[in-house]
Structures are given as structure tokens and as C-alpha cells.
UniProtKB/Swiss-Prot annotation:
Highest rank taxon of the organism: Eukaryota
Disulphide bridges, residue numbers: 27-53, 37-52, 47-64, 75-102, 86-101, 96-113, 125-152, 136-151, 146-163, 175-201, 185-200, 195-212
GO terms of molecular function: growth factor activity
Coiled coil: none
Compartment list: Secreted
Signal peptide: 1-17
Gene3D superfamilies: Spasmolytic Protein, domain 1 (4.10.110.10)
UniProt protein name: Putative gastrointestinal growth factor xP4
Gene symbol of the encoding locus: p4
TM helices/strands, residue ranges: none
Biological processes annotated in GO: maintenance of gastrointestinal epithelium
Organism of this sequence: Xenopus laevis (African clawed frog)
Annotated function: May act as a growth factor.
InterPro entries: P_trefoil_chordata (IPR017994), P_trefoil_CS (IPR017957), P_trefoil_dom (IPR000519), P_trefoil_dom_sf (IPR044913)
Length: 224
């Protein structure tokens, strides 16, 4: 974990001071990394009621998908000069906390309200090879019942469990992404609030780069 935190600090130094992290970007899962969380044709309301995320902006990706589960916020105050701004001049500690950010005003001439690194847990169904699936439900279990129990469902392959245990990963998520490495999460003229609602990061300090982008993942640890 130490190496990943160091990497995040180094990137933050390059980014500048206008990158913001939303209060809750648990739905900011890149399209290619999404795990299905609902049947075909599920509506946004039905998807959200299931505790899932819905995003239909990419026609070739899963629209109703499993969110990240947040475990901890890492403020890492040891490198004050590497902080990435998460507020505005004069922001109070209470308002900073409401944004899901870190606040430390003990050191002058550095950002006081700054981006944390989020420790999250992800259920990864796509990483489980069919022959290595571990059964996670009774015979004939429905997709909805399977998913409600925290399991994965895929009936594309015969002779293996369709309802099976996911691979559980612990990850570090952060918005300190170099401009050239950003993956677009929005559309032209998207606002900061609209970007946050999509569960993504926003940084308008580079005019020629993507402003609304997916958070980066570092330090992946398989825990199950």
C-alpha cells in the first residue's frame, strides 16, 4: 500500500489545485470493469432500488452494475505539499467534510481541504474462470436471488455453476489521474455536479484534457 500512496502523492503534485473528488463515487466503475447487477431492459429506478448503479451513456457496456463498497478514507497528512485541492478559499471543516474530503489547517501555505484516497472493496465476477466457479446458490436459483445474496450469475457456460462466488478485491481509488491517462466519464460541457452524479472525478485545470473522468485504481489486493 505504501508504494501506491507514494504514487498518488507524486501524481497529485503534477495535477494542480482544481481536481475535485465527489462525496460518493462508488458508481464510478469503468465500463469494461462493470459486473452485471440486473436483467436486460431493467429501468434506472429498478436498478437503483436493487442497490446497484445505472449508467447508459456507453451503449456497449453494462448499464446496471455492481457498485464499489467503501471501507475507509485515507487522508495521509504526511505530505502537505502534495495535497490536491477539494474545496474553495475559506471553506470550513464542516463543509469540507460534507464534500467527503479531508481537512487539516495546522500547516500554513498548503491546501487545507484536500482529496482523500478511498479504500474500497469490489466484487469482480468477470475475473472468475468458469471452471473455477464456487457454487453460491441452490439449484434453480433465479438471477435476482443470486445477486441479492452477493453472488454472481452467468448462464452462458454449461456444466458449471451459474450462481457463483465473486472474486473480492480491495482497492485504492483516487482522482489524482494524469491528464493523458484519463478515461472520459462525461460529455461536452458537462458540469461538475453532473459529473459527480455519475460517480466520476472532475478537474478543469487543464483546458485541453478530459475534465470529467473515471477514478483511478491502485494497489489491488485479492482478499477472497
Amino acid at each position: 500500500m505504501a508504494n501506491s500512496v507514494f504514487w498518488a502523492i507524486a501524481v497529485a503534485l503534477v495535477l494542480g489545485a482544481e481536481a475535485y473528488m465527489p462525496l460518493d463515487y462508488r458508481c464510478g466503475v469503468k465500463p469494461k470493469s462493470r459486473d452485471n447487477c440486473g436483467p436486460p431492459g431493467i429501468s434506472p429506478d429498478e436498478c437503483v432500488k436493487k442497490g446497484c448503479c445505472f449508467d447508459d451513456s456507453d451503449p456497449d457496456s453494462i448499464w446496471c452494475y455492481t457498485p464499489w463498497k467503501f471501507e475507509d478514507t485515507i487522508c495521509n497528512p504526511a505530505e502537505p505539499k502534495a495535497r490536491v485541492n477539494c474545496g474553495y478559499p475559506g471553506i470550513t471543516s464542516q463543509d469540507c467534510d460534507k464534500k467527503g474530503c479531508c481537512f487539516n489547517d495546522t500547516i500554513p501555505n498548503v491546501v487545507w481541504c484536500y482529496q482523500p484516497i478511498i479504500e474500497a472493496v469490489e466484487r469482480d465476477c468477470s475475473a472468475v474462470e468458469p471452471k473455477k466457479r464456487v457454487n453460491c446458490g441452490p439449484p434453480g436459483v433465479s438471477p435476482d436471488e443470486c445477486i441479492k445474496n452477493g453472488c454472481c450469475f452467468n448462464s452462458d457456460v454449461g456444466g458449471v455453476p451459474w450462481c457463483f462466488k465473486p472474486e473480492i478485491k480491495k482497492e485504492l481509488l483516487q482522482c489524482a489521474v494524469l491528464p493523458k491517462a484519463r478515461i472520459n466519464c462525461g460529455y461536452p460541457d458537462i458540469t461538475m455536479d453532473q459529473c459527480y452524479k455519475k460517480g466520476c472525478c472532475y478537474d478543469s485545470s487543464e483546458s485541453d484534457s478530459i475534465w470529467c473522468f473515471y477514478p483511478d485504481i491502485e494497489d489491488v489486493t485479492i482478499i477472497e
